[in-house]
Curated annotation (Swiss-Prot):
A GO cellular component entry from the record: cytoplasm
Pathway annotation: Cofactor biosynthesis; 7,8-dihydroneopterin triphosphate biosynthesis; 7,8-dihydroneopterin triphosphate from GTP: step 1/1
Organism: Streptococcus thermophilus (strain ATCC BAA-250 / LMG 18311)
Protein name: GTP cyclohydrolase 1
Residue sites binding Zn(2+) per the record: C76, H79, C148
Record family assignment: Belongs to the GTP cyclohydrolase I family.
HAMAP family: FolE (MF_00223)
SUPFAM superfamilies in the cross-refs: Tetrahydrobiopterin biosynthesis enzymes-like
GO molecular function: GTP binding; GTP cyclohydrolase I activity; zinc ion binding
PROSITE patterns xrefs: GTP_CYCLOHYDROL_1_1, GTP_CYCLOHYDROL_1_2
Self-association state and partner proteins as the record states: Toroid-shaped homodecamer, composed of two pentamers of five dimers.
EC number annotated for this UniProt entry: 3.5.4.16
Length: 187
């Protein structure tokens, strides 16, 4: 985190502005706890999702690689409240280059740990994978519930937002796209 002390001061001032007493027993360590939490939740600001693809292997595989149901949480940059859900990340290797499966989950994790929009999160994961491996195709789907729609405003708990990014063959070929969507939904 850039400046933990500054975050602590901001939380202290926020509590005061809300009419709370930051010196009372229950709130005494809250600024420090919140700053520590934000350091963890926003740790992706100092990392690039593309850099997670450190394990690249020479392996001939010309069929889809899909990691489904990758749980994540992030913070809506508009309200600084959580959104969370599942990411599904697929790629079609272009010859003899594959990556470790955990690297797909790590890219999701890094992209999610920052003030974020779901649309951007989806694109950042897809772009990182495309740039790291240069596969024939990439397809990323993110399903999430946004607390900004659950706790405030319209108050619609349980509603989910789905975003997708298709690159390469999954953008160009309708049949390939249908196949990957079927795999993501059916299993």
């Amino acid at each position: 985190m850039e400046n933990q002390e500054k975050v602590e001061q901001a939380v202290y001032q926020l509590l005061e502005a809300l009419g709370e007493n930051p010196e009372r027993e229950g709130l005494l360590d809250t600024p420090k706890r919140v700053a520590k939490m934000y350091a963890e939740m926003f740790s992706g600001l100092n990392e690039d999702p593309k850099d997670q693809f450190t394990a690249v292997f020479s392996e001939v595989h010309d069929e889809v690689v899909l990691v489904k149901d990758i749980p994540f949480y992030s913070m809506c940059e508009h309200h600084l409240v959580p959104f969370y859900g599942m990411a599904h990340v697929a790629y079609l290797p272009s010859g003899d280059k594959v990556t470790g499966l955990s690297k797909l989950a790590r890219a999701v994790e890094v992209a999610a740990r920052r003030p974020q929009l779901q649309e951007r999160l989806t694109d950042q994961v897809a772009t990182a994978l495309e740039e790291a491996l240069n596969p024939r195709g990439v397809f990323v789907m993110v399903e999430a519930e946004h607390m900004c729609m659950t706790m405030r405003g319209i108050k619609k708990p349980g509603s989910k937002t789905i975003t997708t990014v298709a690159k390469g063959i999954y953008k160009e070929d309708r049949e390939e796209r249908k196949e990957i969507l079927s795999l993501m939904r059916d299993f």
